[in-house]
Swiss-Prot record:
It comes from the Bacteria. InterPro entries: Elong-fact-P_C (IPR015365), NA-bd_OB-fold (IPR012340), Rib_uL2_dom2 (IPR014722), Transl_elong_fac_P/YeiP (IPR020599), Transl_elong_KOW-like (IPR013185), Transl_elong_p-like_YeiP (IPR011897), Transl_elong_P/YeiP_cen (IPR001059), Transl_elong_P/YeiP_CS (IPR013852). PROSITE patterns: EFP. Belongs to the elongation factor P family. GO terms for biological process: peptide biosynthetic process. This is Elongation factor P-like protein. GO terms for cellular component: cytoplasm. GO terms for molecular function: translation elongation factor activity.
Length: 188
């Protein structure tokens, strides 16, 4: 698979190891004939040691096919997250290092997740595209302040902060994109 086709959460083989891509940065070419490069922040699976590597857009990487099991978040056990397989009720425990920055999107009752397994042991988590989270703190809307729409910060129930439109109030449930971390609208 080409480096340009990789997505956040993909599992690849690199330097005789297995890694999960956690962040992707694209650099545009400078001048004529320059190549687009991708910088990946990867973590070893299992283990969690960090590795940064850069690749040309057409450079080939070997994607690892993992067994994926649909699961829902059950509870937190210390720093570990426990997920329940929705088919056979198996519990999968993932350490905080395996979850990484995605921990801010995991709330009580979250479903539609996929636990990724190597040899029947959980190594990574794939979140749904959008999650519903409750706003626990945001400044009130300024009436008549300006005709332009200004975003404001909102603290969510999981502790992360996202920028939301002025009309969002404390206590509302909103959609958050798990790839970009951006506001995606009011939850119905």
């Amino acid at each position: 698979m080409k480096a340009s086709e990789m997505k956040k959460g993909s599992i690849v083989e690199y330097n005789n190891g297995t890694y999960q891509i956690r962040d992707i940065q694209r650099s545009s070419p400078q001048g004529r004939g320059g190549n687009v490069r991708f910088r990946f922040v990867m973590y070893s699976v299992p283990g969690g040691s960090k590795l940064e590597a850069s690749f040309d857009a057409d450079e080939m990487l070997t994607a690892v096919e993992l067994l994926r099991r649909e699961a829902s978040f059950s509870y937190k056990d210390g720093e570990a997250f426990v997920f329940l397989d929705e088919e056979d009720y198996t519990l999968y425990t993932l350490e905080a290092e395996a979850i990484g920055d995605n921990a801010g999107y995991i709330s009580e009752g979250l479903s539609g997740c996929y636990v990724q397994l190597i040899d029947a042991s959980p190594v990574a988590l794939q979140l749904p595209q959008h999650v519903v989270l409750e706003v626990v703190d945001t400044p009130p809307e300024l009436k008549g302040g300006t005709a332009t729409k200004r975003p404001k910060p909102a603290k969510l129930i999981t502790g992360i902060e996202v920028m939301v439109p002025e009309y969002i109030t404390t206590g509302e449930r909103i959609l958050v994109n798990t790839t970009t971390g951006a506001f995606g609208g009011r939850a119905s």
